[in-house]
């Protein structure tokens, strides 16, 4: 062999191999699915390239995968006649992992997590899965269109290094030979290999053939037997495809080891002709929040594979949806640029978005437990929807789930439809509060009057919630109202004030003026309130004023936010307010008012500009 060299694996590959061999061993047969899946992708790529360069077929357009074994040498070989690889591609694909964020992902995995095959599985280990059952892997490959002498040899024991060299290979494509570990002779059994291929690869459009050896006239005759249906699953009628086939096809296109939660398979004819097969995963990919995370659907045109990750067919808030679209209306030479400006794409995006939302709505109605799994994994992504897609806002709002004062649990399980069904007679608005945590929202003094009246409040504590609510203005004709903002509907909820209370409050007017004079422009307004039962004071904002949580979002993003001007509301029935009102000494009065304001700000913001001053003041007043 010419040009032979030994190279070290990228460190991430070594880590991944170690984790994978130990964590996926219990489900080791998946290596065959992964290698056949890769062969199918190689055939798809060749078909696509050959649209503009038919010579790449080299006179052999019958694409297939062939599986054979050699019992004497204990090897299993998977060979395809797809696109193949040149030397540079071999080093890129088999010596490194190109995914960004890989290192951080692997470092975050502790020894316990290493046992989690789902976590490793969703990484999409592909080729490296061969080392689960093999102690040495040999690859012989040649890129379509290259000369026979430009073949490439690659070999590794899956430890620290691999060997690469130049060889002569007459036919294009890739041949992977697994030298099986001791105890893995199961994979040299014809029936066993057939059953694995049938289980995992029936849906692949590429014929998968297994070697047959027969003795005739003292000679061994080799033939090849096709053992899968070799028809693209999405082109078959729904009634012909069973659940297991749909699940296996999902694992093939999504490179995920978990079953999907649900799917929707549809063929549309008429003005537009297309087939779609959409899936909702059961687990978020580990790099979903990585800016480089690829998402989108597989695109086929007239059953010819065009591209992976075509994100033009789904809005960003549905980026977790996996699957494919096969269109009859797009040109075969379509590019990402053409897709961007195509009216066909826009129409497909509208239709597929509606289909995905309907699929989620059906899941929510049919299986609340599965929908909760979806919500825990992807709820934060779906919450981007009301801002991003106003035309589907009502449909998205139906899918949102919240923690509320009704359930006494931090689990987000309550739909807006449920909330509306429990609204009190005369209640006009849907009440909510945003806070840094569920505990802070639940114990907020803003809820006191609503609790007393038995009115349910949505408790929002995800970082995105305040931003979402600035776009989500109503549901089922009912407006949303933050309980931290001043509003007439909240004032109406308070009990009727009797004459003696009115007189007592009139007597407090000089006190309110005194507080205003003391605080000056540090607050927007000072007033008495009937919204409180146990708390002496709160701060609220006007309807058009920026909220506390929104100001925090700006600050977290490093942006300057206008200073929030609060309304300082005092509970005239509370003993501390009465005590402050009765204090004649100006210095002592100032300390009481500052303490009440600090308490209200602490409850609202969770922090104070000067906590030491607050502690000093508290200690002083407790001791007096």
UniProtKB/Swiss-Prot annotation:
Annotated region described as C, given as residue ranges: 553-624
InterPro entries listed in its UniProt record: HATPase_C_sf, Heat_shock_protein_90_CS, HSP90_C, Hsp90_fam, Hsp90_N, Ribosomal_Su5_D2-typ_SF
One Gene Ontology term, aspect cellular component: cytoplasm
Locations listed in the record: Cytoplasm
One Pfam family in the UniProt entry: HATPase_c_3
SUPFAM superfamilies given in the database record: ATPase domain of HSP90 chaperone/DNA topoisomerase II/histidine kinase, HSP90 C-terminal domain, Ribosomal protein S5 domain 2-like
CDD domains documented for this protein: HATPase_Hsp90-like
Location of region: B: 337-552
Domain of life assignment: Bacteria
Subunit structure: Homodimer.
Protein purpose: Molecular chaperone. Has ATPase activity.
UniProt similarity note: Belongs to the heat shock protein 90 family.
Protein known as: Chaperone protein HtpG
């Amino acid at each position: 062999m010419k040009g032979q060299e030994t190279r070290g694996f990228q460190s991430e590959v070594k880590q991944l191999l170690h984790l994978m061999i130990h964590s996926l061993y219990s489900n080791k047969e998946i290596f065959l699915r992964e290698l056949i899946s890769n062969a199918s992708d190689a055939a798809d790529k060749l078909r696509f390239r050959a649209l503009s360069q038919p010579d790449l077929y080299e006179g052999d357009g019958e694409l297939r995968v062939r599986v054979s074994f050699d019992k004497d040498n204990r090897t299993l070989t998977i060979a395809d006649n797809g696109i193949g690889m040149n030397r540079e591609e071999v080093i890129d694909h088999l010596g490194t992992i190109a995914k960004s964020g890989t290192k951080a992902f692997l470092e975050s995995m502790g020894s316990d997590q290493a046992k989690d095959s789902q976590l490793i599985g969703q990484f999409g280990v592909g080729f490296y899965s061969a080392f689960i059952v093999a102690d040495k892997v040999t690859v012989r490959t040649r890129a379509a269109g290259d000369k026979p002498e430009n073949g490439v040899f690659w070999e590794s024991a899956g430890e620290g290094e691999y060997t690469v060299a130049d060889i002569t290979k007459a036919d294009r494509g890739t041949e992977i030979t697994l030298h099986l570990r001791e105890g893995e002779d199961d994979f040299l059994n014809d029936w066993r290999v057939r059953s694995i291929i049938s289980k995992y690869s029936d849906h692949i459009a590429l014929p998968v053939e297994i070697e047959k050896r027969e003795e005739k006239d003292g000679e061994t005759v080799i033939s090849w037997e096709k053992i899968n249906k070799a028809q693209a699953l999405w082109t078959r009628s729904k009634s012909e495809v069973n659940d297991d086939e749909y699940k296996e096809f999902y694992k093939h296109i999504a490179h995920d080891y978990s079953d999907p939660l649900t799917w929707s398979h549809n063929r549309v004819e008429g003005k537009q002709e297309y087939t779609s097969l959409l899936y909702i995963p059961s687990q978020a990919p580990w790099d979903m929040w990585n800016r480089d995370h690829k998402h989108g659907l597989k695109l086929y045109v007239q059953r010819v594979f065009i591209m992976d990750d075509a994100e033009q067919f789904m809005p960003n808030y549905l980026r977790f949806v996996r699957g494919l679209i096969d269109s009859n209306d797009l040109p075969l030479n379509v590019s990402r640029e053409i897709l961007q400006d195509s009216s066909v794409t826009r129409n497909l995006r509208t239709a597929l978005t509606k289909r995905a939302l309907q699929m989620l709505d059906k899941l929510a109605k049919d299986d609340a437990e599965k929908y909760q799994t979806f919500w825990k994994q992807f709820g934060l992504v779906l919450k981007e929807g009301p801002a991003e897609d106003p035309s589907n806002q009502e449909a998205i709002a139906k899918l949102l789930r919240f923690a509320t004062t009704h359930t006494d649990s931090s689990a987000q399980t309550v739909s807006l439809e449920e909330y509306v069904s429990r609204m009190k007679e005369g209640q006009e608005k849907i009440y909510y509060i945003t806070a840094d945590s569920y505990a802070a929202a639940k114990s907020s003094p803003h809820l006191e009057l609503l609790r007393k009246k038995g009115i349910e409040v949505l408790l929002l504590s995800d970082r995105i919630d305040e931003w979402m609510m600035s776009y989500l203005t109503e549901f089922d004709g009912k407006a949303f109202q933050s309980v931290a903002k001043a509003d007439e509907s909240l004032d109406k909820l308070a009990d009727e004030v009797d004459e003696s209370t009115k007189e007592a409050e009139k007597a407090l007017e000089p006190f309110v003026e005194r507080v205003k004079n003391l605080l000056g422009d540090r607050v927007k307004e000072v007033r008495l309130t009937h919204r409180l039962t146990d708390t002496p004071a709160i701060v609220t904002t006007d309807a058009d004023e920026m909220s506390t949580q929104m100001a925090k979002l700006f600050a977290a993003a490093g942006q300057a936010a206008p200073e929030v001007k609060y309304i300082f509301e005092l509970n005239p029935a509370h003993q501390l307010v009465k005590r402050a009102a009765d204090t004649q000494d100006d210095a002592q009065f100032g300390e009481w008012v500052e303490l009440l304001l600090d308490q209200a700000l602490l409850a609202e913001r969770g922090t104070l500009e000067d906590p030491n001053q607050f502690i000093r003041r508290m200690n002083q007043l407790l001791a007096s």
